[in-house]
């Protein structure tokens, strides 16, 4: 009898032996084995010896499929589908509703934390109701009542302003429907941009908490469970606004709660990649004790009424100045395209090559809002110290203080579409992005 998915098997090929759980494969030419360490390994079936160790050692769900089948071949992908494209399950869930618990809406946009492998097809599924969530993260049970919703199922590098608008509308819908908090599951690469966007689009009376995962669920070092649990705890806390909740350190003990407009992904792969820039995090969540504490002033729950202002002007560019930049080429491009807004990430206190200043003056004269940020991680722009800075101010550049460059771009997109004076808006803090005082750097 041939082994089936879920059986424990021993596979020998080319003098290498692997033992683990047989998983369904998307092709008939390869075996997929989940090793005891949690990782999956693919093995070419040619010349492989397969021995059954234990039957039904692992419940993977779905219909059993013989190892020779190709159930996943040609399966449709859920990537890039919109909310209306995705077939949802019944709103009714087998998960009992507990009136003593708060209600948290879990919204998925894709990314590592929200990805679930459908082993019957080999595809990533976008099904995302309360049962799916609790099946993936059992530790969430008993903390809240959950509603699941998919806005997109995309890699975060494919995020667009249009998706931000759909996401903001979905969050607003969930709050109107009675959610006590919202958790947005999002890929980590562009999470800071999406959190910034919703910070401007939404006045929210409840916490809206972005979270994600640096390591996928099949890896022993995955951070998905702790991040999801801590995000739910933050979403039920006495606070309002838009935040990011991720590992505070490499240990599995605490998550940091960052303001959506002050957070930055500072490492490509570490679990504690996200940091609040220029300040301490808003708060922290202790994983073991489920304690949420706050380090800084924050708006209390229900301290504002829900308001959605989601219009964006996408004609905003972010230009990072570098030595050797072809100024003639940049000038020709900018003056020909004439964006509505330009964010410059300048050097140091906010500088560019002096030969680029006339280009800035020309853009401002044409009605372009030009704001200056710094490439430096810490500190703030001050163009009143050196001649170059003073010349930039005379040319019409707006100092954006210590606003992060990416946040500044999103802010200007929103301000151009919604604020009566976008230039002046860049000088003010609209969503906690601009601090009046930079804390000492350690």
Curated annotation (Swiss-Prot):
Q: What does this protein do?
A: Allows the formation of correctly charged Gln-tRNA(Gln) through the transamidation of misacylated Glu-tRNA(Gln) in organisms which lack glutaminyl-tRNA synthetase. The reaction takes place in the presence of glutamine and ATP through an activated gamma-phospho-Glu-tRNA(Gln). The GatDE system is specific for glutamate and does not act on aspartate.
Q: Where is the active site?
A: 112, 188-189, 265
For this protein's source organism, the top of the classification is: Archaea, Methanobacteriati, Methanobacteriota, Stenosarchaea group, Halobacteria
- Residue ranges, annotated region (Disordered): 63-84
Catalytic activity of the protein: L-glutamyl-tRNA(Gln) + L-glutamine + ATP + H2O = L-glutaminyl-tRNA(Gln) + L-glutamate + ADP + phosphate + H(+)
Gene Ontology MF: a single term: ATP binding
Could you name the domain of life of the organism this protein comes from?
Archaea
* Subunit and interaction comment: Heterodimer of GatD and GatE.
Sorted alphabetically, which SUPFAM superfamilies does this protein's record hold?
A: GatD N-terminal domain-like, Glutaminase/Asparaginase
Q: Which protein, by its recorded name, is this? A: Glutamyl-tRNA(Gln) amidotransferase subunit D
> What EC number(s) would the UniProt record show?
6.3.5.-
So what family is this one in? Belongs to the asparaginase 1 family. GatD subfamily.
One of the protein's GO biological processes: regulation of translational fidelity
Gene behind this chain? gatD
């Amino acid at each position: 009898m041939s082994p089936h998915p879920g059986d424990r098997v021993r596979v020998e090929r080319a003098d290498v032996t692997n033992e683990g759980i047989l998983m369904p494969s998307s092709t008939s030419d390869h075996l997929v084995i989940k090793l005891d360490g949690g990782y999956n390994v693919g093995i070419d079936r040619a010349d492989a010896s397969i021995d059954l160790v234990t039957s039904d050692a692992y419940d993977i769900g779905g219909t059993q499929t013989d190892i020779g089948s190709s159930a996943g071949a040609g399966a449709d992908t859920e990537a890039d589908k919109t909310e209306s494209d995705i077939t949802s399950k019944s709103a009714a869930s087998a998960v009992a509703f507990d009136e003593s618990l708060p209600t948290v809406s879990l919204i998925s946009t894709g990314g590592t934390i929200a990805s679930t492998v459908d082993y019957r097809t080999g595809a990533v599924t976008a099904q995302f109701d309360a049962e799916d969530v609790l099946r993936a993260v059992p530790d969430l049970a008993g903390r809240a009542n959950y509603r699941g919703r998919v806005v997109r199922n995309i890699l975060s590098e494919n995020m667009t302003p249009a998706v931000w608008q759909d996401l903001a509308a979905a969050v607003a819908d969930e709050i109107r429907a009675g959610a006590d908090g919202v958790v947005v599951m999002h890929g980590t690469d562009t999470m800071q941009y999406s959190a910034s966007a919703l910070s401007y689009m939404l006045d929210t009376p409840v916490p809206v908490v972005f979270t994600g995962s640096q390591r996928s669920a099949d890896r022993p070092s995955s951070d998905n469970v702790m991040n999801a649990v801590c995000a739910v705890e933050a979403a039920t806390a006495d606070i309002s606004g838009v935040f990011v909740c991720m590992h505070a350190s490499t240990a599995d003990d605490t998550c940091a709660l960052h303001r959506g407009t002050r957070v930055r992904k500072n490492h490509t792969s570490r679990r504690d990649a996200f940091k609040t820039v220029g300040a301490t995090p808003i708060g922290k969540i202790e994983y073991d004790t489920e304690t949420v504490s706050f380090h800084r002033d924050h708006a209390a729950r229900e301290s504002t009424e829900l308001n959605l202002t989601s219009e964006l002007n996408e004609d905003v560019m972010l230009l990072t100045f570098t030595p050797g930049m072809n100024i003639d080429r940049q000038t020709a491009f900018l003056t020909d395209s004439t964006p509505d807004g330009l964010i410059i990430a300048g050097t140091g206190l906010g500088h560019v090559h002096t030969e680029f200043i006339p280009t800035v003056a020309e853009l401002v004269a044409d009605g372009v809002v030009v704001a200056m940020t710094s490439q430096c991680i810490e500190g703030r722009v001050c163009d009143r110290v050196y001649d170059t800075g003073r010349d930039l101010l005379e040319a019409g550049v707006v100092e954006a203080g210590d606003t992060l460059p990416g946040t500044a771009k999103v802010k200007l997109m929103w301000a151009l579409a919604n604020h009566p004076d976008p230039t002046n808006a860049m000088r003010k803090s609209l969503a906690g992005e601009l601090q009046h005082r930079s804390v000492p750097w350690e």
